[in-house]
Amino acid sequence: MNRPWKKSDDHVRLAIRLTPNGGRDAIDGAETDGEGEAYLKTRVTTVPEKGKANKALILLIAKSLGIAKSSVSLVSGDTARKKILRIDGDPEDLGKKLETLLG
């Protein structure tokens, strides 16, 4: 299975599919869409207005990986369900944390 992240020199780019108003804040695993692109399924309880769901997503990812939320930023998908996050840090370490997170 493809992994929903790509390692760079000093960061990782993580593909996300976010469901706002999802009942709880959670990471529901990785999936692949019809085009073969992998993404991390996530949901937050926050409503999708004025960037609230994006902020909740960044907090969820940072907390799940045990990193500062300032290390996580939204690269694309501000108003879309599919998003790309940039996570600053050691790519090898982040890759291991993401592998552990997915089980």
Swiss-Prot record:
What is the similarity comment for this entry?
Answer: Belongs to the UPF0235 family.
Q: What is this protein called?
A: UPF0235 protein Rleg2_3707
SUPFAM superfamilies reported for this sequence: YggU-like
| Taxonomic classification | Bacteria, Pseudomonadati, Pseudomonadota, Alphaproteobacteria, Hyphomicrobiales
Top-rank lineage group of the source organism: Bacteria
Any one Pfam family match given in the protein's UniProt record, by short name? DUF167
- Protein species of origin: Rhizobium leguminosarum bv. trifolii (strain WSM2304)
